[in-house]
Amino acid sequence: TALRALHPGDIAVIGNATGCMQVSSLMYPDAAYEDSYIHNAFENAGATISGVETAYKALRKKGKIGEEYKFITFGGDGGTYDIGFQSLSGALERGHDFVYVCYDNGAYMNTGIQRSSATPMYADTTTTPVGTESDGKPQVRKDLAAVLAAHNIAYVGQTTFVGNMKDL
């Protein structure tokens, strides 16, 4: 069986940080999303979705929202592994109820192929030093799954996904 973040009939709020995923999933006239959609900056996908989820809980508790919503957000590897990690870590540590998907292509591809901590060791990017002494990025790739699992959350998974974004 397939694990799905959303099922037919679910009502969702979807967040998406600026990056390759945001650009590739909102091509006119076919957007991948039919639910409420929030576009946010590279670094604040975790903060945005945790804030929306908190507001939802407060409004539901007051009886102003009757429907049950699910929350899912997307971030690129740069915005997840690096510049947005603190907001994601905080949201996980506080126990917010959401699904986070990292669209990882191994570098800041949307802004010119700069290295991120998701870039594999020895990979060349536009920020790799040049010359015969350079063997590419000298650091190992961050083990994000292990770092996220250390937050004692219910589930961490990794996959290679090459299908239709609407199938996610």
Question: Which sequence ranges carry the predicted segments?
Answer:
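Thiamine diphosphate
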Residues: 1-69
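Short hydrophobic segments within beta-strands
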Residues: 15-17, 74, 101
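A near-ubiquitous, low-amplitude feature marking generic local secondary-structure context
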Residues: 25, 31-35, 74, 131, ...
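Secretory-pathway/luminal and periplasmic proteins that interact with or process carbohydrate-rich
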Residues: 26, 80-83
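A general structural-boundary detector
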Residues: 35-38, 78, 135
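Short glycine-rich loop/turn motifs that provide flexible caps or phosphate-binding loops at active sites
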Residues: 50, 75, 83
